[in-house]
Design a protein with these regions (language model features):
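Acidic donor-binding/catalytic loop of UDP-sugar-dependent glycosyltransferases
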Residues: 68-69, 126-133
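Glycine-rich, basic loop-to-helix element that forms the pyrophosphate-binding segment
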Residues: 90-114
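Hydrophobic/aromatic residues located in beta-strands of well-ordered beta-sheets
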Residues: 59-61
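A conserved acidic beta->alpha catalytic loop
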Residues: 63-73, 91-93, 123
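Short, acidic, metal-binding catalytic loop of nucleotide-sugar glycosyltransferases
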Residues: 47-56
């Protein structure tokens, strides 16, 4: 089975943005961030996306069975900001048994639920430079 089929079958909960505020005349860019641990890095990564000047950014947060502090932070961002979607996995999807398929599940679930015509992914410990989008 390929990673797309695995993603469709995986056990997750999708929470669409509470408030959507997109410019109808501009493309939506979705940035997917999957998170498990490293709250300090997660905060920097997420903030670098929220600080972009381009307003049609959908932030797709993936709680990959995250540690409690990371999970709480992601939920707070989801509730507080416009254009933020949240995907919650009950348990971490990573496995050394099949790294390529397991890692791709989170990313593909994000892609399957995204609104953007342009879709990107960054790791929890990466940051976007100013005006990247």
């Amino acid at each position: 089975m390929n990673a797309i089929e695995e993603a469709k079958k995986s056990n997750y909960k999708y929470l669409p943005p509470i408030v959507e505020n997109y410019e109808p005349s501009s493309q939506i860019i979705t940035v997917i961030v999957d998170c498990y641990y490293g709250l300090n890095y997660v905060q920097q990564s997420v903030q670098s996306i929220l600080d972009q000047d381009y307003r049609n950014v959908e932030l797709m947060l993936i709680d990959n069975g995250a540690e409690q502090d990371v999970s709480e932070y992601l939920h707070n961002i989801y509730v507080k900001w416009n254009n933020v979607a949240l995907i919650e996995f009950k348990e971490n999807q990573f496995s050394w048994d099949d790294i390529d398929i397991r890692v791709a599940i989170c990313w593909n679930v994000g892609v399957l639920n995204s609104k953007g015509s342009i879709i990107g992914h960054i790791n929890y410990d990466d940051m976007l430079s100013v005006n990247y989008c």
